[in-house]
Amino acid sequence: MSRESNDTIQSDTVRSSSKSDYFRIQLNNQDYYMSKPTFLDPSHGESLPLNQFSQVPNIRVFGALPTGHQVLCHVHGILPYMFIKYDGQITDTSTLRHQRCAQVHKTLEVKIRASFKRKKDDKHDLAGDKLGNLNFVADVSVVKGIPFYGYHVGWNLFYKISLLNPSCLSRISELIRDGKIFGKKFEIYESHIPYLLQWTADFNLFGCSWINVDRCYFRSPVLNSILDIDKLTINDDLQLLLDRFCDFKCNVLSRRDFPRVGNGLIEIDILPQFIKNREKLQHRDIHHDFLEKLGDISDIPVKPYVSSARDMINELTMQREELSLKEYKEPPETKRHVSGHQWQSSGEFEAFYKKAQHKTSTFDGQIPNFENFIDKNQKFSAINTPYEALPQLWPRLPQIEINNNSMQDKKNDDQVNASFTEYEICGVDNENEGVKGSNIKSRSYSWLPESIASPKDSTILLDHQTKYHNTINFSMDCAMTQNMASKRKLRSSVSANKTSLLSRKRKKVMAAGLRYGKRAFVYGEPPFGYQDILNKLEDEGFPKIDYKDPFFSNPVDLENKPYAYAGKRFEISSTHVSTRIPVQFGGETVSVYNKPTFDMFSSWKYALKPPTYDAVQKWYNKVPSMGNKKTESQISMHTPHSKFLYKFASDVSGKQKRKKSSVHDSLTHLTLEIHANTRSDKIPDPAIDEVSMIIWCLEEETFPLDLDIAYEGIMIVHKASEDSTFPTKIQHCINEIPVMFYESEFEMFEALTDLVLLLDPDILSGFEIHNFSWGYIIERCQKIHQFDIVRELARVKCQIKTKLSDTWGYAHSSGIMITGRHMINIWRALRSDVNLTQYTIESAAFNILHKRLPHFSFESLTNMWNAKKSTTELKTVLNYWLSRAQINIQLLRKQDYIARNIEQARLIGIDFHSVYYRGSQFKVESFLIRICKSESFILLSPGKKDVRKQKALECVPLVMEPESAFYKSPLIVLDFQSLYPSIMIGYNYCYSTMIGRVREINLTENNLGVSKFSLPRNILALLKNDVTIAPNGVVYAKTSVRKSTLSKMLTDILDVRVMIKKTMNEIGDDNTTLKRLLNNKQLALKLLANVTYGYTSASFSGRMPCSDLADSIVQTGRETLEKAIDIIEKDETWNAKVVYGDTDSLFVYLPGKTAIEAFSIGHAMAERVTQNNPKPIFLKFEKVYHPSILISKKRYVGFSYESPSQTLPIFDAKGIETVRRDGIPAQQKIIEKCIRLLFQTKDLSKIKKYLQNEFFKIQIGKVSAQDFCFAKEVKLGAYKSEKTAPAGAVVVKRRINEDHRAEPQYKERIPYLVVKGKQGQLLRERCVSPEEFLEGENLELDSEYYINKILIPPLDRLFNLIGINVGNWAQEIVKSKRASTTTTKVENITRVGTSATCCNCGEELTKICSLQLCDDCLEKRSTTTLSFLIKKLKRQKEYQTLKTVCRTCSYRYTSDAGIENDHIASKCNSYDCPVFYSRVKAERYLRDNQSVQREEALISLNDW
């Protein structure tokens, strides 16, 4: 199949469906507003039908049609609600229930009004019983449901309280919870679920997916005529859609009653009953009885349980068919050998359960059974479930008044040619629980003798371990294998005699089973071979392979004193021949015989010919170049390979233009940057500096309409009375990019609003939108023009909800909110996606896009813009900002930021903004409540006090303290795949299956998490064989009685993810577009599964936490790891030891094994442990480290191999300085280089030489300042005082004092360096920004601080583990007599100027000479002159080479290869570019003291 067809699979699939019967709206954005009821809204409830509603909420959906046209949809009749327990009896008549509802309704309305009343003469004050119009509570009714929090069977009755104002929901629930309404406290249910999430869950809607309505009402005019967008955007597809659904006699609303409020093309109104997505819900009433136990669920729909998961599976199946892939089959399941779950305290728990069972049972002799345990009261059938009760308050279908002012009547009953199908994200259809592993065949180990270590053996083992810790050997391998061998001997001694007798008997029996005769001869056993020797050595406790220990190749580096650290002594030797012990021949006679002078036979052969020139040339070309020596003045890179230069890999597909789909299902995106002329070196201030130019760029692939306009453009303020040739120059500079000129800034802003209204983008973005881009424009309009441009940019004219000072948004995403549009602050979006030391656009472009961007100061840009006579400078400014706008789109597209958030929204069900704005609990809840609602579960809403009062978390995951050491043999890494989700599935842990704490169970007042509940009598006796007791003592129902809701949710997630990943592997690398789409989906699934446990354990800000459930999950994970460790270490054939474990992973050391054996053993371990755990818990063999270093918890590094065929290792580090961002680049490079040298050579002499060389460079200043920049987050306003502020904040504060606009964003990374200062000066007072450092020629890096405080401590943490003290190596360095030539203090300049050394050869002067030359150099004048010239030319050449690099970089802006480009390139001050630092250094080399001295000497010598 061709690439084109692959890239448009989605659109092809959509077009293949039949003509749609639905009017479809993509749910891109939503909010709500309050209004007076219209005939499209409910006007009264059923509990108090005589009282009218004073106001009702309406939901606004900002979306798009399949044709790409924007639409605003008003949804009427959706009311927020919550539940409380019904205080009556099931035997109450319907009349009595209605009376109770009316009384509750009246009480609520009165008490809530009173709580809102602030003055005595408040107009809402009640007189008698006259309620009048209802302001807060719409209706109260009775529904039946199952409480979700705790194990409940049988229907419970609840009051459903429907409200009129969603913003009052939280306050009303607190009043009821605190007992201020009814005089007693009630538990609240589902009040923590936000209004908009409630409606999307009830109607089966998902963010960025389609709302299907069978009809709608249009507001007049049907097509908006503002800016003639109706004429510009109308096309055949839209006309066909309108012809089908728009009947001007029946469904066009009156302008008087329903005026247009939106600025978009189409505006419609719908009622709840029009939404057909709800019909796809699969409702399951299975928890009011033991239906799952009795097997009465054959006609009830099964998984996938969420429609988004179901749609995802259907879409994947269709895509596989389009790609001609085989039908998807679930991976084969590993055979399990799990009979029962025995925890450490299982015996104790069973005894407690029997006591609880006795305590909660009756003594009438009757044995309870599942068939008649629940009282099947027929009155429940007359009461609705929440699902059935939803339509009660829906407005009735109105008779629409004909709108005579509309366009001419039209009818067309033909179906529309839909070019799409529903594209929603999916779920799972398979019984594949959890991620499945590799298909390794099961190995039988039945031939191994079984032995159990006795307590005596354990004591001996402990003695061996104690002896090991006190040993003075360097290598652990021998001690570890000796320890394992002793355990084998002790365990095998019991069966030794039986084995020997059996072997003797077997020798007398032939292979056929007959006994040998008396005279029979039997072949003797062959002599032992190489493998027998290895096996014997292993049996005796010697490693099969004794890998080389670290050593010194240079014997001079060996110290006389022993190498010791932390009570251990390390035997480090040298491989040099001088350190070897000589062989003594004392007392022995050595005879030397003369060799015969002739040979009986002689043979001759031709010698190899010397290689030809071509052969040498070919060989040389094949050998990778080691590069030149110019980097000697910089910190050595950790690797010469170019693939390590970039932090993130290239994206080949990103360079290709993505093909538009015929169905619009993305979000349109407009980005913008501005240029403002400033004053001197100040940052532009919106209160002073006007915007001179606006550069906008529309992401072409997201814009579906063909408006015959460009996708990028420029707006410029230029008065016609000024330079008349300026517009012509601009147009000449920018070629085909459209440019518009405006007389004033205000006119340009008005044109910008018109542009936004015309394009109507869903997303507005800028690299930094608070101080620049949109934020600058908004602030400028407010302060100077008194013009609220935010209202003009919004998608509505009234009921506008905007925010300009959202504190949380300012610190985490965007502090600006524009109604109907999403705002993306690009640098902050990247901050959550990628780890960079700085988040400037130059750093992001280089690391993500692999593009180096020049940076000019605002002062330079202002000067170039004002120099209007220079075309090159104008062109530079225009291209500078235009490229930045283009980079904005490229960065988001490269990271798939928008596409990934869309996929999450479609899967989880929340809107696009909530994906990146809301936390993980909100996402879990969205998915969870959809399953709960389909099964009539009602969720508890605990208050903050309830959350604080629940039992504290007690269990912690297993995080072993590693045996810190250098491991020279293979180290296996095993990882449980999705451990916590798999535990919840495998052991059926959930809110809905919790019965209680086994030690405290009784019939009433069972404390569990944030709630208390009662148990029906005899329930424990009934469930005696259908419960699981978790290792923390909480009892859960098994799947035979009730499959947990969390299990259903996670099964959907994990199964679909497995299907997606398998499809990704099968489609290969050709179809990159589809692969990126699938990758975004699997990432969304992975993130959702990983945060589910956090939802249960959120003990501070939890929405529905349960500490007992969270402890069950954690403790089960802990004991699962402990069981795995026991299985691994008991198998004697592996000779393995677990040296580290962390939550869900194990590090297993194999002393003396080969890497190939390590892979084989690793797979066997993973399979064995998996077999001993319930489905779907799966232990995966991840990789082999060889060699490696374990430093401490969560800190380790090693050479990683993921397959036996892998030849080149991957440097894999976690938690150490090479991957941390709180240090400096030099620290990362030096430490990684040292670790690589240790792993590759184990030669400590090479490491010592390398380190001393780097330390020496630092001391003499022969380094790049960029490598020594710290970049730490700054949170101004979060520090107690200026005295406690960190160094970065001090640097920023100094900058703000000079320019108030220089204040950084919250958590922005600020670079700074540490320089030498006065004695006693504080560290933070010696910190300067890179700008200050480069401007101050008298500043010098504090080499002692960097070496002793930044470099040596982390190196010591690594090399102390092998007995090496790096600090001693640093002290051996002979410090340079000369100070740095580039960073010398003022007092040093004088000293160097009068130093008694020759400025040519460096020899000490015997007498003072004006030329600063020694007698020898004076005598050899020609040689000295030549030396000066060579040095001068070398410096000049280096400088010119660097200037050429800068000119090449800036050429993309100037398109000028002349002198002017050279001048512009010199203005670049990109502090993210290493060339900039090198250029500044080279420039200073040409004018430092030594260069001046040499120049003066050269002039004086010029007379020769």
Swiss-Prot record:
It comes from the Eukaryota. It is an enzyme of class 2 (transferase). InterPro entries: DNA-dir_DNA_pol_B (IPR006172), DNA-dir_DNA_pol_B_CS (IPR017964), DNA-dir_DNA_pol_B_exonuc (IPR006133), DNA-dir_DNA_pol_B_multi_dom (IPR006134), DNA/RNA_pol_sf (IPR043502), DNA_pol_B_thumb (IPR042087), DNA_pol_palm_dom_sf (IPR023211), DPOD/Z_N (IPR056435). GO terms for biological process: DNA replication; double-strand break repair via homologous recombination; error-free translesion synthesis; error-prone translesion synthesis. Gene3D superfamilies: DNA polymerase family B, C-terminal domain, DNA Polymerase, chain B, domain 1, Helix hairpin bin, Palm domain of DNA polymerase, Ribonuclease H-like superfamily/Ribonuclease H. A motif (CysB motif) lies at residues 1446-1473. Its cofactor is [4Fe-4S] cluster. Zn(2+) binds at C1398, C1401, C1414, C1417. Its EC number is 2.7.7.7. It catalyses: DNA(n) + a 2'-deoxyribonucleoside 5'-triphosphate = DNA(n+1) + diphosphate. Disulfide bonds: none annotated. GO terms for molecular function: 4 iron, 4 sulfur cluster binding; DNA binding; DNA-directed DNA polymerase activity; nucleotide binding; zinc ion binding. [4Fe-4S] cluster binds at C1446, C1449, C1468, C1473. Its main location: mitochondrion. Pfam families: DNA_pol_B, DNA_pol_B_exo1, POL3_N, REV3_N, zf-C4pol. One of its GO terms (cellular component) is mitochondrion. It is found in: Mitochondrion; Nucleus. Binds 1 [4Fe-4S] cluster. Keywords: 4Fe-4S, DNA damage, DNA repair, DNA replication, DNA-binding, DNA-directed DNA polymerase, Iron, Iron-sulfur, Metal-binding, Mitochondrion, Nucleotidyltransferase, Nucleus, Transferase, Zinc, Zinc-finger. A zinc finger (CysA-type) spans 1398-1417. Nonessential DNA polymerase. Required for DNA damage induced mutagenesis. Involved in DNA repair, mitochondrial DNA repair and translesion synthesis. Translesion synthesis in S.cerevisiae may use a specialized DNA polymerase that is not required for other DNA replicative processes. Has a role in the bypass of abasic (AP) sites. Highly inefficient in incorporating nucleotides opposite the AP site, but efficiently extends from nucleotides, particularly an A, inserted opposite the lesion. Belongs to the DNA polymerase type-B family. Forms DNA polymerase zeta with REV7. The CysB motif binds 1 4Fe-4S cluster and is required for the formation of polymerase complexes. This is DNA polymerase zeta catalytic subunit. The lineage of its organism: Eukaryota, Fungi, Dikarya, Ascomycota, Saccharomycotina.
